[in-house]
Amino acid sequence: MTKEEKYMHDAGAWECEQRSPHHIYSVGEHTKAVVKYCIDHGAGVELIKAAWLHDAGKMKTKKFDGKYDHFKNHPEVSAQIAEELGESEYVIRLVRFHDAALGRSDVTVQELASYGRKWCDDLAILLMGDLAGQHPTYQIGEKLQQRGIFLQALYRTLEELESIS
């Protein structure tokens, strides 16, 4: 068991339910599905570490509103956990921006593209793995379209940056 997987077990990820329209799995079950997706799509060691830790902050940020669970700011808390575990900046960045396709205002496509093609490829796999680990009916429609539009913009910007250098 890797230190990342051990952290998730010790933090209670398998007991942490996600009551929402887009999740039917606990944080741990969802994470395991994301890791599997990433491995199935050629993930290297760093992407696998990021897949294990992308939702590590959910156990610390979980709030229930009487109907649904919310995990506000969990990517940043997850990135802090990755940093505390001694992960590379590459992994920490993947964890921090794993939800970048959801219209975050604190990062631009230009900034993400500046991290290079390999990092963008890993982010794309993580984004799609994160979606694949959610409720099956949530994987289609708006969320998939939203991620597709984001990835098109990311790769268009990456190609522009690569043509300059």
For each predicted feature, which ranges?
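Exposed alpha-helical structural elements
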Residues: K3-K6, D10, E46, Y90-L94, ...
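Acidic/His-rich, divalent-metal-binding segments that scaffold phosphate/diphosphate chemistry
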Residues: M1-F64
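Short, polar loop/linker segments at the starts of domains and inter-domain junctions
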Residues: I24, Q110-L112, K143
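Divalent metal-dependent catalytic cores for phosphoryl transfer on phosphate-bearing substrates
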Residues: Y37-Q139
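Residue-level detector of solvent-exposed, low-hydrophobicity positions
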Residues: W14, P21-H23, H30, T61, ...
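Charged substrate- and nucleic-acid-binding regions of tRNA-handling and nucleotidyl-transfer enzymes
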Residues: W119-D121, L126-L127, L131-S165
